[in-house]
UniProtKB/Swiss-Prot annotation:
It is found in: Cytoplasm. Its EC number is 3.1.-.-. GO terms for biological process: rRNA 5'-end processing. Keywords: Cytoplasm, Hydrolase, Nuclease, Ribosome biogenesis. One of its GO terms (molecular function) is nuclease activity. This is Putative pre-16S rRNA nuclease. Could be a nuclease involved in processing of the 5'-end of pre-16S rRNA. One of its GO terms (cellular component) is cytosol. Transmembrane segments: none annotated.
């Protein structure tokens, strides 16, 4: 079974995939946002290519655990993504995922400019790995 990780941003959507047997998430691609229909179609194409059986969307909670506008955006997007993909979609707390993604990319020696195109997909991998780790026995 493969799971798709989604980091939903206002400009870009990061995507990652994990094989649940290997329990390791990896960044796949970044989708530049257009219309919601085009965004959903692009995500669905990746989901088909990787034969995913579920998806996890990052829920950007505030540090105190409350929900702001971005969290409401993710909550609204998740059911539409579920309908587009035809697989279950879960929300997962993504606090500090972008910070962790930037840290990982810096550790690989990428400059801020090089990170720009990869940070969203890496953040999706951070979210997905957190979800996998939480499910670990």
């Amino acid at each position: 079974m493969r799971t798709l990780g989604v980091d939903l941003g206002r400009v870009r959507i990061g995507l990652a995939v994990a094989d649940e047997i290997l329990r390791t998430a990896r960044a796949v691609t970044t989708v530049v946002r257009r219309t919601e229909a085009e965004d959903l179609a692009a995500i669905a194409e990746v989901a088909r290519d990787y034969e995913v059986t579920r998806a996890v969307v990052g829920l950007p909670l505030n540090m105190d655990g409350t929900e702001g506008p971005s969290a409401r955006l993710a909550r609204g997007f998740a059911p539409r993504l579920e309908a587009a993909l035809g697989v279950p979609v879960e929300l997962f707390d993504e606090r500090l995922s972008s910070f962790e993604a930037e840290s990982r990319l810096r550790a690989r020696g990428l400059s801020a400019r090089e990170q720009r195109g990869q940070v969203d997909a890496e953040a999706a991998a951070v979210i997905l790995q957190g979800w996998l780790d939480r499910r670990a026995p």
